């Protein structure tokens, strides 16, 4: 946790995930009304990837924006943190 991606010469994979903006305040299903529309989100996503490539000085792997993707994750680190908010957001 004390080293940056650049110090470790690691790689970066950027995947869009609108579900991070889910609201569970009301009803039985999450609402995604706060997620940005495609015409706003896609340029932001591409801009972030470009900035990351410039900062790292190498290509950044990326997912297909808006696609249904299967992603496998292997955490290699000392901790995993789950934060449970009392506001249910």
List PLM regions with ranges.
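Basic, gly/Ser/Thr/Pro-rich low-complexity segments located predominantly at protein N termini
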Residues: 32, 68-71, 82
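Structural motif
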Residues: 11-14, 80
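Compact, glycine-rich, soluble single-domain proteins
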Residues: 1-9, 22-34, 38-51, 55
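Nucleotide and nucleotide-moiety/phosphate-recognizing core
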Residues: 58
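Short, low-complexity, polybasic intrinsically disordered segments
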Residues: 76-89
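Short, well-ordered secondary-structure micro-motifs
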Residues: 25-28, 73, 81
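Glycine/charge-rich, flexible interdomain linkers and switch-proximal surface loops
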Residues: 1-12, 61-74
């Amino acid at each position: 946790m004390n080293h940056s991606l650049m110090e470790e010469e690691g790689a970066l994979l950027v995947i869009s995930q609108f579900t991070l903006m889910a609201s569970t305040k009301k009803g039985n299903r999450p609402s995604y009304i706060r997620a940005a529309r495609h015409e706003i989100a896609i340029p932001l996503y591409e801009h972030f990837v470009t900035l990351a490539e410039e900062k790292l000085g190498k290509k950044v792997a990326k997912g297909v924006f808006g696609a249904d993707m299967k992603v496998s994750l292997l955490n290699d680190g000392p901790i995993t943190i789950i934060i449970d908010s009392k506001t249910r957001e």
